[in-house]
Amino acid sequence: MIRTKNIFLIGPVGAGKSTIGKQLAKQLKLEFIDSDDTIEKKCGVDINWIFDLEGEEGFRKRERDVIAEILAEKQNIVLATGGGAILDPDTRSLLSSRGKVVYLEATIEQQLERTAKDTKRPLLRVDDKKPVLEQLMAEREPLYRSIADVVVETNGATVKNIVNKISTFLVEETIL
């Protein structure tokens, strides 16, 4: 049996999924894919526009379909998912059955700092982001943990240190 090396990064907005994913893929010599970028390319519009037109439910359906399509076509990838991808039970099942799931944990303070000037996140287009982030975390944290093969805290760690922690885990799990 040929072992696939799919690595899925999940976690809240501002956890560093895309930044860490790019470096992890480079280190492991795997292809990096960002599901949000893929959705935007496929639809020809940005995520805010999709949310405005179709709502969160419409976006989550597109997200689920794009992730399923990526996994049907690609192997040996590092995939950074959107923060809410785990809300869909089919997406959770697909991720947990097709590779190793790495939950990048971030505090609310870290998320606030990293998203302070960000206008690309539809759920954070509000003046006071903290209560929104707290609500999202309360809703999503149990789902992140339910499918995570490993939890990596990102607070105060460098990208290099986080990538090394993930790589060490993958070696121990004999995926590398």
Curated annotation (Swiss-Prot):
Function comment: Catalyzes the specific phosphorylation of the 3-hydroxyl group of shikimic acid using ATP as a cosubstrate.
Organism whose genome encodes this protein: Francisella philomiragia subsp. philomiragia (strain ATCC 25017 / CCUG 19701 / FSC 153 / O#319-036)
Co-factor(s): Mg(2+)
Keyword DNA repair listed: no
GO cellular component: cytosol
Protein name, per record: Shikimate kinase
Pathway named in the protein's UniProt entry: Metabolic intermediate biosynthesis; chorismate biosynthesis; chorismate from D-erythrose 4-phosphate and phosphoenolpyruvate: step 5/7
Residues the entry annotates as binding ATP: 14-19, 121
Binding site for substrate: 36, 60, 83, 140
Reactions the enzyme catalyzes: shikimate + ATP = 3-phosphoshikimate + ADP + H(+)
Residues holding Mg(2+): 18
Keyword annotations of the record: Amino-acid biosynthesis, Aromatic amino acid biosynthesis, ATP-binding, Cytoplasm, Kinase, Magnesium, Metal-binding, Nucleotide-binding, Transferase
GO biological process, one term: amino acid biosynthetic process
HAMAP family assigned: Shikimate_kinase
Cellular compartments annotated: Cytoplasm
Listed EC numbers: 2.7.1.71
Family membership: Belongs to the shikimate kinase family.
